[in-house]
Regions:
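Alpha-helical interface subdomain recognition
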Residues: 1-69, 163, 168-302
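FAD-binding core of flavoproteins
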Residues: 70-184, 188
Length: 302
């Protein structure tokens, strides 16, 4: 496969990156998700990429940039549901109904999309009774516990298998963006922080940490692009295998790189003021979305 970006893809990447830098600096990201966030991204065309004729490979490029900025919100659901559900959608993957559900961004959404075993169902949020968690894992992702999630109605035009695959790939692209951002943040700090009258980045132990982190991010990026290409053209390869591999590698890269960035920052890495903790908490959370690392590893092994 040939993964060099075309001129159009580079323009897409640069455009989304400029939007993220302009509209979603760290201070804005820390405020969390609101309707304005969704509207701002909608204006850029992020959610309508597939509907507008772009490929899944193009969409992963956009989501990598969103991940680099750790933009909050039910972004993947915005792409999957575009043109099918009005307002702000959120969702969850629940192949075995009946158990209590954890729903992200319930208060800000208009509808919850539920991926059941054989269909996508839509449930209006005004029909849902949920209890917001006081201390969610990711402070930028509010979560509500729903004891009895209504069945909802089947969403016409939604292929549940394709949604699961696409959702996993877009989430993996977001994770790759976070993995690269962690490398960049840790490298910048290692070049700036001095000990023994020299940058700490000059020490071999730090160099090895950062080199390993970069390798993880690049390997994951390649896997994600390969999975996106198979979504666009299933004849290229085994779609399920590519998706499982991409989500597994991207999740590992995001989590391990966030931990590495925390370590390189030393004591500062554990403070609220340093942005690294935002990536670490989001990385933990995203490893529970569209399949856990264990579920993807088991699928690959089988």
């Amino acid at each position: 496969m040939h993964f060099d970006l075309t001129d159009d893809q580079e323009a897409l990447r640069d455009g989304i990156r400029a939007v993220c830098q302009g509209r979603f600096p760290s201070e804005r990201v820390r405020e969390g998700f609101d309707r304005g966030t969704f509207d701002a991204l909608g204006e850029t065309g992020v959610f309508s990429l597939i509907a507008d004729g772009f490929s899944w490979a193009d969409a992963t490029i956009a989501f990598e940039e969103l991940g680099r900025a750790v933009v909050p919100g039910p972004l993947v659901w915005g792409v999957l549901a575009h043109g099918l559900v009005a307002g702000v959608p959120t969702g969850l993957d629940r192949p075995a109904p009946g158990a209590p559900a954890m729903v992200e961004h319930l208060a800000a959404a208009d509808a919850v999309l539920v991926l059941d075993a054989d269909a996508v169902r839509v449930v209006p949020t005004d029909a849902i009774v949920g209890t917001a968690l006081d201390w969610p894992l990711d402070p930028l992702t509010p979560v509500a516990r729903v004891a009895d999630l209504p069945t909802g109605e089947v969403l016409a035009g939604a292929d549940v298998t394709r949604w699961r695959r696409a959702g996993a790939v877009l989430t993996a692209a977001f994770q790759v963006g976070m993995a690269h951002a962690c490398v960049e943040q840790a490298t910048a700090y290692a070049l700036d922080r001095r000990q023994f009258d020299r940058p700490v980045g000059s020490f071999q132990a730090i160099k090895h940490l950062l080199a390993d982190a970069l390798v993880r991010a690049e390997v994951a990026r390649t896997a994600v692009h390969a999975a996106a290409v198979t979504l666009d053209d299933p004849e290229v390869g085994d779609v399920d295998r590519a998706v499982h591999g991409a989500k597994l590698l991207a999740g590992e890269a995001a989590l391990k790189n966030a931990k590495t960035a925390t370590q390189v920052h030393g004591g500062m890495g554990f403070t609220w003021e340093v942005d690294v903790h935002l990536a670490l908490k989001r990385a933990w959370l995203l490893n529970t979305v569209f399949g856990s690392p264990d579920s993807h590893a088991d699928a690959l092994a089988s």
